[in-house]
Design a protein with these regions (language model features):
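Short, low-complexity disordered leader/linker segments with a strong preference
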Residues: 1-27
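Exported/periplasmic ABC-transporter solute-binding proteins
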Residues: 19-107, 112-287
Length: 287
């Protein structure tokens, strides 16, 4: 990401990164979801072309990091790939913070494998058996495939850390609200890390935002529970709700945004802002 228009793109894995307690009156600090990190940087950069006097800094770390910063009042916008939990809302209110939710787009959580992995599709039940604690699918042979030897047949699991909105959405939709991931899952820091993990081994499988696809991985179509046809995550299937692992993407502010923050949120929801999301592989809001 080019630092051309006072837009800094910073990634961090700390729970509460320092966003700066004091900042210029027009500065916007935007922190949180790793899923939204790249597009948040692209939005900030494009907005900076129009309004270079409004510096926008963008940092990642996960949805939980964004929420923590919002509650601490150390950022103006928190990016989240999940809704705030009630306990987070309660804590925010105790701190004098009033979280206001803004839906800025939609995303399909894609299931990725190595580009040479021959798997054609998976059902939601099979995904549960692959990733879920107690699930009986441990080897690609359990799915009718052979990667060449016993070691390569062991499925390598790429997951996200538990402060990730992607982690929570996948768990709820695939494993169930009370479901747990297998302990042997590799808990990776970011969306890009999951895709790179899948690209590194023909035995690997993982889940991440659709926008992070590369030429080194394939997206596996998923068959919803009770259906027979596998569905790939696309703009159309996410908008229609037919792809089973999809979710809205949010930005949160402290109260209804006004001034430069309000203008920025409004622009993100406009056709021009939504075109940036779509170009990055996300599903735009209906206009």
């Amino acid at each position: 990401m080019k630092n051309l228009f006072a837009c800094a793109l910073i990634t961090t894995s700390a729970f509460l990164p320092s966003c700066g307690q004091s900042h210029a009156a027009t500065e916007i600090e935007n922190v949180g979801s790793d899923t939204l990190l790249e597009v948040a940087g692209a939005l900030a950069e494009k907005y900076g072309v129009m309004k270079p006097e409004v510096p926008i800094s963008v940092a990642g770390g996960g949805s939980g990091v964004g929420v923590a910063n919002l509650i601490a009042n150390t950022c103006q916008i928190a990016n989240c790939s999940r809704p705030l939990k009630q306990k987070e809302i309660d804590l925010a209110k105790k701190q004098g913070v009033d979280p206001v939710q803004h839906t800025v787009g939609y995303d399909g959580i894609a299931v990725f494998v190595h580009k040479d992995n021959p798997i054609q599709s998976l059902t939601m039940e099979q995904l549960n058996a692959i990733f879920g604690e107690g699930g009986e699918v441990e080897s690609w042979k359990d799915l009718g495939m052979d990667m060449g030897d016993d070691a390569k047949n062991v499925i390598q699991l790429g997951s996200r850390q538990n402060n990730s909105g992607t982690y929570e959405c996948f768990r709820e939709k695939v494993l169930g609200k009370k479901g747990r991931f297998k302990q042997r899952c590799n808990n990776l820091n970011g969306s890009k890390d999951v895709v790179e993990f899948c690209a590194s081994s023909k035995s690997a499988i993982g889940y991440s935002g659709l926008a992070y696809k590369t030429d080194d991985v394939r997206i596996v179509p998923i068959t919803p529970a009770g259906q027979t046809d596998a569905i790939s995550p696309t703009v159309d299937t996410v908008q229609k709700g037919t792809y089973p692992i999809a979710r809205p993407l949010f930005m949160y502010t402290n109260g209804e945004p006004t001034g430069e923050v309000g203008a920025y949120i409004k622009w993100i929801k406009s056709a021009e802002g939504q075109s940036v999301l779509e170009a990055k592989g996300y599903v735009p809001l209906p206009q």
